[in-house]
């Protein structure tokens, strides 16, 4: 049974484990693959297969991440687990592994610890929408009241960061016992319960093709007798010939009509998320559009210059800066297809930022960019990447 192929008919959801070091994230990840493979098919993965995560590069940053997949009665899940704390920070900020929901692992024996708090804060900052809690190592706690106390602490911590602490599912168990095949309540049944909680509590994400149309503009051409063509890869949604679109960013927003969509030199009726297309724009002059703007469904996204963000600053070993930067630092911010200069305002009490740190800051750009919460960007100095960030809150 366990070798059966995944049924791709089930909806697909991306999740990941977060939480303090040694609270059992990787053990839980392994237990989930084993118990769910037995119950619903799929491949079991051993702890050491997950723990020796390969390094991958995302936006020039090296991140160690393990990817596993499993299914439940309702869904197919892709699950990421990172070996080290720094990998989590980088992963969440770069969006290398986008999460529709997270499983927060807290050791019942220790309660919430500094990284528990930090990961919840990061989840809030980078826009992880839902968190489900697994209170692990319950076999090491004899006192029922202590378990309740830890659960209360975790719920309060979630509420502190604007997650609905009171409504969050909290499953108590022991990932190790489950992995060992224990059938008592805290063993395998706790994993099934966790899977059910994920199915119920984490909504199925909207597919990119169902979202409002957006295409970052990479190039602009003028075709004599036909007009102006902009090219790029459709990020989300669908564009049909004859539809009205907006050009947003860098200049005043303009409305125009898409009079043709072409792909591989063929004219099409429409282009959709994932397609590399050329869009012919009615009445738009070659010099009114440029790389760095976006083509989008009217009213779906607006241009902004000032925002709060969470930034990971590359270490020297990663090819980043060798020295710290201070308040008023002015690098370039690379959004989608272009660099815009901006100045950085550090939080009160933060004198400087060292390579390898992550920091919350406020940025003011010299030109507006089509922006929404959760938008990823790179921080660059003269074309060299020195950081990665995500917009956490738009100010103006």
UniProtKB/Swiss-Prot annotation:
Q: Where is this region: G1?
A: 19-26
What reaction is this protein's catalytic activity? GTP + H2O = GDP + phosphate + H(+)
User: Can you tell me which residues bind GTP?
Assistant: 19-26, 81-85, 136-139
Record-linked Gene3D superfamilies: P-loop containing nucleotide triphosphate hydrolases, Translation factors
Pfam families for this protein: GTP_EFTU, GTP_EFTU_D2, GTP_EFTU_D3
EC number(s) on file: 3.6.5.3
Q: What does the UniProt entry say about where the protein is found?
A: Cytoplasm
**Looking at the record, which segments are called G5?**
174-176
PROSITE patterns (UniProt xref): G_TR_1, G_TR_2
Instruction: Give the SUPFAM superfamilies listed for this entry.
Output: EF-Tu/eEF-1alpha/eIF2-gamma C-terminal domain (SSF50465), P-loop containing nucleoside triphosphate hydrolases (SSF52540), Translation proteins (SSF50447)
Q: Where is the tr-type G domain?
A: 10-206
Keywords, comma-separated and alphabetical: Cytoplasm, Elongation factor, GTP-binding, Hydrolase, Magnesium, Metal-binding, Nucleotide-binding, Protein biosynthesis
HAMAP family for this protein: EF_Tu_B
The UniProt entry's sequence similarity note says:
Belongs to the TRAFAC class translation factor GTPase superfamily. Classic translation factor GTPase family. EF-Tu/EF-1A subfamily.
Which purpose does this protein serve, as stated in its record?
Answer: GTP hydrolase that promotes the GTP-dependent binding of aminoacyl-tRNA to the A-site of ribosomes during protein biosynthesis.
Protein name, entry field: Elongation factor Tu
Q: Which organism is it from?
A: Alkalilimnicola ehrlichii (strain ATCC BAA-1101 / DSM 17681 / MLHE-1)
């Amino acid at each position: 049974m366990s070798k059966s192929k995944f049924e791709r008919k089930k909806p697909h959801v991306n999740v990941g484990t977060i939480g303090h070091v040694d609270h059992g994230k990787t053990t839980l990840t392994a237990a989930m693959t084993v118990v769910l493979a037995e119950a619903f098919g799929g491949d079991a993965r051993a702890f050491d297969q997950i723990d020796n995560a390969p390094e991958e590069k995302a936006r020039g940053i090296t991140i160690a991440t393990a990817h596993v997949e499993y299914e439940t009665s309702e869904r197919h899940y892709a699950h990421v687990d990172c070996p080290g704390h720094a990998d989590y920070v980088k992963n969440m900020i770069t969006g290398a592994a986008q999460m529709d929901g997270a499983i927060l692992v807290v050791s019942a024996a220790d309660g919430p610890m500094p990284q528990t708090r930090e990961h919840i804060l990061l989840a809030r900052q980078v826009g992880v929408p839902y968190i489900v809690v697994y209170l692990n190592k319950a076999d090491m706690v004899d006192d029922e009241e202590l378990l309740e106390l830890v659960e209360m602490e975790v719920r309060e911590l979630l509420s502190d960061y604007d997650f609905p602490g009171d409504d969050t599912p909290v499953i108590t168990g022991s990932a190790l016992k489950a992995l060992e095949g224990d059938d008592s309540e805290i063993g395998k049944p706790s994993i099934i319960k966790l899977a059910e909680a994920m199915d119920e509590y984490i909504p199925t994400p909207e597919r990119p093709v169902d979202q409002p149309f957006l295409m970052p503009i990479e190039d602009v051409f003028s075709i004599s007798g036909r007009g102006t063509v902009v090219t790029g890869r459709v990020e989300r949604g669908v564009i049909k010939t004859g539809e009205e679109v907006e050009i947003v960013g860098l200049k005043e927003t303009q409305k125009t009509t898409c009079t043709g969509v072409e792909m591989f030199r063929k004219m099409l009726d429409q282009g959709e998320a994932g397609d590399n297309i050329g869009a012919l724009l009615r009445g738009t002059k070659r010099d009114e559009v440029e790389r760095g703007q976006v083509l989008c469904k009217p009213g779906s996204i607006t241009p902004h210059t000032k925002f709060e963000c969470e930034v990971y600053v590359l270490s020297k070993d990663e090819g980043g800066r060798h020295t710290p930067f201070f308040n008023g630092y002015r690098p370039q911010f690379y959004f989608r297809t272009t660099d815009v200069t901006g100045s950085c305002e550090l939080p009160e009490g933060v004198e400087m930022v060292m390579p390898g740190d992550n920091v919350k800051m406020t940025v003011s750009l010299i030109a507006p960019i089509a922006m929404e919460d959760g938008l990823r960007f790179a921080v660059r100095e003269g074309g060299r990447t020195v950081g990665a960030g995500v917009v956490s809150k738009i100010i103006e």
